[in-house]
Amino acid sequence: MADEMDFYSSDYHNDDAFETPSKPPTSTSGRPKGSGAQGGGGMRFDTEEAREAALRKELEGVRKINEVIEGMIGTLERAKGNMGTVSQTVTNATTLLNTWTRMLSQTEHNQRLILNPEWKGATQDLLELEAEERRRQEEVERRAAEAERRREEARRKAEEEERRRAAAAAAAAAPAGRSVGRGTTRGRVRGSGLTRGASSSASGSETTRTTSGIARGGFGYTRGTARYRGAK
C-alpha cells in the first residue's frame, strides 16, 4: 500500500514537471534583490585593483631603473678612483724621470769637469765666482756713479744758464741807469764850478785856476762815481 502511494506521488510530480506553468517566473535568475549594486561595487573594486597593480608594476620598474643608475654611479666612482690612482702614478713617474734626468745631467757635468785639463778644482771655481760677483758689483757702482755725474752736470748747466739769464737781465737794465746818473752829475759839478769861480774872481787869477782845477777834479771824480753806480 505504501508502495502504491509512492508510485502515484512520483507520477504526480512527473506530470507537474511537463505541464506549462500558468504564471511566468518572477525572476529569471536566482540572485536576490540588490545583486546589481553589489556587481557595480565589484567592478569598481576590480578597477582599483587593476590600477594598484599597474602602479605597483610601474613602481617596480622605477626601482629597477634606480638600481641601474646607482650601479652606474658606483661604476663611475670606482673609475674616478682608478683615474686618481693612475694620475698619482703618472705624477710619481714624472718626478722620478726628472730626478733621473738631473742625475744624468750632473754626471755628464762632472765627467766634463774631470776630463777638462784646464779645470783647477772647486777652489778655483769659487774664486772665479767671487771675481764675477765683484765685477758685477763694480759695474753696478760704475753705473750709479755715471748717473750721479750726469745729474751733477745737468744741475751745473742749469745754474750756469740761470747766471747767464741774470747777467743778461742786469745788462739790459744798466744803460738807462748810466744815462740818468751822468746828466745829474754833470749838472751838479758844473753849477758848483761856476759858483766857486765867481767867488774866487776877486782873489786873483791863480785862485781861479786852482778853483777850476778843483772843479775839474771834482767833475772827474763825480763822473767816475756815476759810472760805478750805473755799473751796479
UniProtKB/Swiss-Prot annotation:
Residues 1-44, 133-232 are annotated as: Disordered. Keywords: Cell cycle, Cell division, Centromere, Chromosome, Chromosome partition, Coiled coil, Cytoplasm, Cytoskeleton, Kinetochore, Microtubule, Mitosis, Nucleus. Pfam families: DASH_Duo1. Residues 128-171 form a coiled coil. It is found in: Nucleus; Cytoplasm, Cytoskeleton, Spindle pole; Chromosome, Centromere, Kinetochore. InterPro entries: DASH_Duo1 (IPR013960). Component of the DASH complex consisting of ASK1, DAD1, DAD2, DAD3, DAD4, DAM1, DUO1, HSK3, SPC19 and SPC34, with a stoichiometry of one copy of each subunit per complex. Multiple DASH complexes oligomerize to form a ring that encircles spindle microtubules and organizes the rod-like NDC80 complexes of the outer kinetochore. DASH complex oligomerization strengthens microtubule attachments. On cytoplasmic microtubules, DASH complexes appear to form patches instead of rings. Belongs to the DASH complex DUO1 family. This is DASH complex subunit DUO1. It comes from Chaetomium thermophilum (strain DSM 1495 / CBS 144.50 / IMI 039719) (Thermochaetoides thermophila).
